[in-house]
């Protein structure tokens, strides 16, 4: 019997097994769309970034003006720049929803897939941070100064490490050049890590909303989920284009329209909105090293989930108390994002500290309450 080319061809067969003939659970909801949406975001970022890099100059005397030149003089440069900046915001919205789905439905039990996902999250956060420095506005410069300075909290090695990252005794031309280099290369490392993420996922198959084995009820990925994904693509792209064409600088910081000036500190230094929750956690610890540890742990704590799973069911769909706790945690993250944008004064400091405790408490108490609920129903 003649097999189709997509099965016979050595390269097409890989694509076929990932996108066409992949057996997928018949009942996965729209919450499973974010993986493909993230891939779309990554492609948008790589393509717009590639064209921006053709016109950008990584030099402290030229960087700000080169971004200005892109927006004013390059054909559709304004569109490339705003698509890239807002594309990053959509990337993080999709990542946070993707992670939230994984926590809710117990997808973290695919341990290798989950751990690679946590690594991807760190890589994407690093990439976005370095990208924010490139326009060399006030917030770019001071954001880079404050965040890189956190390395000095590391005992013994700290000061040397900071000067090594800076390439000197302050954030200067060497810093901008290396940040541009890393910002260019990291998305391709993210792309490679994404392929490993997908490889691990296809070893086990997808989870589903009821968390049971779905081998008896699988359907081919194409046409069912290709079309479902395309609907997601259209919706997200439309919202992104509307934002870019109506209010492209809504999510940015006005201070970044002022060229970087080492002699003038902005009133309130803050990162992009998608890092504010972690920034609020960092600020809520009144100790430099403690703050840095809390900052890293706010993301790294996701890696403990597969090893601290005590329930009889896969997700929290069948645990009413844990569902309430989950949504409290979601609201906590939103409130932390708001606190991160507020000045360091009362009552914001205290509220930030309370929210930080609630955030970390979720990961500690959630499995224990699940265990208690299981025992209650035995």
Swiss-Prot record:
Protein name according to UniProt: Cytochrome b
GO terms classed as biological process: mitochondrial electron transport, ubiquinol to cytochrome c
Remaining remarks: Heme 1 (or BL or b562) is low-potential and absorbs at about 562 nm, and heme 2 (or BH or b566) is high-potential and absorbs at about 566 nm.
Cofactor: heme b
Organism the protein comes from: Cochliomyia hominivorax (Primary screw-worm)
Transmembrane segment boundaries: 34-54, 78-99, 114-134, 179-199, 227-247, 289-309, 321-341, 348-368
Mode of membrane association: Multi-pass membrane protein
Quaternary structure and interacting proteins, as annotated: The main subunits of complex b-c1 are: cytochrome b, cytochrome c1 and the Rieske protein.
Cellular localization per UniProt: Mitochondrion inner membrane
């Amino acid at each position: 019997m003649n097999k189709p080319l997509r099965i016979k061809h050595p390269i097409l067969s890989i694509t076929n097994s990932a996108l066409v003939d992949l057996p997928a659970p018949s009942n996965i909801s729209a919450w499973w769309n974010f993986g493909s949406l993230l891939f779309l975001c990554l492609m948008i970022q790589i393509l717009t970034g590639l064209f921006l890099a053709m016109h950008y100059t990584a030099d402290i005397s030229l960087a700000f003006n080169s971004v200005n030149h892109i927006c004013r003089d390059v054909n559709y440069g304004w569109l490339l720049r705003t698509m890239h900046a807002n594309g990053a915001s959509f990337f993080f919205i999709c990542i946070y929803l993707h992670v939230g789905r994984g926590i809710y439905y117990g997808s973290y039990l695919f341990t290798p897939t989950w751990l690679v996902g946590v690594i991807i999250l760190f890589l994407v956060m690093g990439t976005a941070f370095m990208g924010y420095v490139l326009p060399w506005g006030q917030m770019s410069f001071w954001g880079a100064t404050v965040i890189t300075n956190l390395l000095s909290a590391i005992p013994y090695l700290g000061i040397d490490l900071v000067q090594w990252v800076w390439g000197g005794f302050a954030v200067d031309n060497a810093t901008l050049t290396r940040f541009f280099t890393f910002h260019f290369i990291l998305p391709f490392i993210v792309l490679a890590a994404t392929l490993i993420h997908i490889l691990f996922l296809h070893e086990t198959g997808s989870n589903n909303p009821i968390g049971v084995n779905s081998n008896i009820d699988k359907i081919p990925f194409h046409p069912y989920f290709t079309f479902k994904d395309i609907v997601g693509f259209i919706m997200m792209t439309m919202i992104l284009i509307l934002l870019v064409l109506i209010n492209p600088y809504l999510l940015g910081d006005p201070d970044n329209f002022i060229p970087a000036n080492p002699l003038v500190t902005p009133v309130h230094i803050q990162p992009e909105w998608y890092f504010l929750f972690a920034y609020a956690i960092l600020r809520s610890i009144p100790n430099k090293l403690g703050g840095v540890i809390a900052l890293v742990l706010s993301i790294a704590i996701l890696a403990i989930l597969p090893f601290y799973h005590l329930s009889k069911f896969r997700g929290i769909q069948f645990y009413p108390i844990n569902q309430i706790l989950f949504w409290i945690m979601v609201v906590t993250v939103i409130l932390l994002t708001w606190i991160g944008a507020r000045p360091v004064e009362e009552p914001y400091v205290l509220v930030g500290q309370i929210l930080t405790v609630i955030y970390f408490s979720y990961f500690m108490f959630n499995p224990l309450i699940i265990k208690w609920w299981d025992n209650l129903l035995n």
